[in-house]
Design a protein with these regions (language model features):
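Short, solvent-exposed loop/turn and secondary-structure capping segments
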Residues: 31-32, 117-118, 189-191
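His/acidic metal-ligating clusters that form di-metal
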Residues: 55, 60-74, 147, 156-246
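Extended active-site neighborhood of metal-dependent phosphoesterases/phosphodiesterases
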Residues: 2-11, 86-175, 199-205, 219-222, ...
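Residue-level marker for buried hydrophobic side chains located in beta-strands
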Residues: 19-21, 77, 106, 178, ...
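The substrate-binding groove and active-site-proximal loops of carbohydrate-active enzymes
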Residues: 47-53, 81-83, 152-156, 205-210
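Feature marks short, surface-exposed loop/turn motifs that line or immediately flank catalytic pockets
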Residues: 26-29, 112-114, 184-186
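Active-site glycine-centered loops adjacent to acidic/histidine catalytic or metal-binding residues
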Residues: 24, 79-80, 109-110, 181, ...
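N-terminal active-site segment of His-dependent metallophosphoesterases
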Residues: 1-87
Length: 271
């Protein structure tokens, strides 16, 4: 697997930190008790996501093992680790994530809620609570010198509570590394998304267009606020490796799926 290495400079760090970053693994699995129909669905989706010749589960295992062998401080899992919500898939996801001791920083994507009705329901959150620090909508992990923040934007319907909690994290003043699934619209990302997904690709694959909810547009404005202590934003969803500025000096990094044979590694060093 190819590694893209990025060095991030942050003020006030007393040591070097290393994080890996992947997303969109699309694990699908059926437990025997779920029956033949569930098994057929899992097999079909696994085959669909193996278009590179690499099984999603094998690629995810390799990504986790690389982070483990490197002694990384963690691995960012920016959504769609699960292809859809089912008992079998959740069992496979848990077994996968528990296979190494490296801390996992996981946020929901659109596929983690696949099949949930109504579309804006948060009723699926309990299935992921133990994997997302008890709070899939918003979690924060404090490293002392900086903090990691994960938010669910997988349905493009940001909630008032999420933005309030993000504002509280801003007020703490520490540099933040922000994990989401759907990248926000920037000048840098529009053309790569159009090239991969067509002229209308940004409508589906990016957050921040005029037809998105006011809360979602407000969220994007918060990420572009020059006063916000955001050091960098990390995302997935577009199945494309990308790095581009949100505003000068603030990068948005998007991972390609592990099954496409690329993983990103970040080295955080003192400025």
């Amino acid at each position: 697997m190819k590694t893209e290495t990025v060095t991030l400079k942050m003020p006030g760090l007393s040591r070097r930190y290393t994080f890996y970053h992947t997303s969109d693994c699309h694990l699908a699995w059926a437990a025997p008790e779920e029956g033949a129909e569930a098994a057929a669905k899992a097999q079909a989706m696994t085959e669909a996501w193996s278009y590179t010749g690499r099984l999603p589960a094998d690629a995810m295992k390799q990504a986790l093992q690389m982070a483990q062998e490197d002694g990384a401080d963690g691995i960012f899992l920016c959504g769609d680790v699960a292809d859809y919500l089912s008992d079998g898939t959740m069992k496979a996801v848990r077994e996968m994530l528990n296979s190494t001791s490296t801390p996992k920083y996981y946020v929901c994507g659109n596929h983690e809620r696949s099949g949930v009705q109504p579309a804006d329901s948060r009723a699926f959150y309990p299935a992921y609570q133990d994997l997302m620090y008890g709070s899939p909508g918003f979690w924060k992990v404090d490293f002392g010198e900086f903090a990691l923040v994960g938010l669910d934007n997988g349905d493009k319907r940001m909630q008032e509570e999420q933005l309030d909690l993000l504002e509280q994290a801003f007020q703490a003043g520490k540099p933040l590394l922000l994990l989401i699934h759907i990248p926000i619209i920037t000048e840098a990302i529009l053309e790569p998304v159009r090239q991969k997904w067509g002229e209308n690709g940004p409508d589906y694959f990016l957050l921040g267009k005029e037809t998105d909810t006011e809360l979602s547009r407000r969220f994007c404005r918060m990420l572009a606020d020059t006063e916000a202590p955001i050091a960098a934003v990390f995302a997935g969803h577009i199945h494309l490796s990308h790095a581009g500025e949100i505003i000068p000096g603030r990068m948005q990094y998007v991972s390609s799926p592990a099954f496409e044979g690329v993983i990103r590694k970040y080295i955080l060093e003192a400025e």
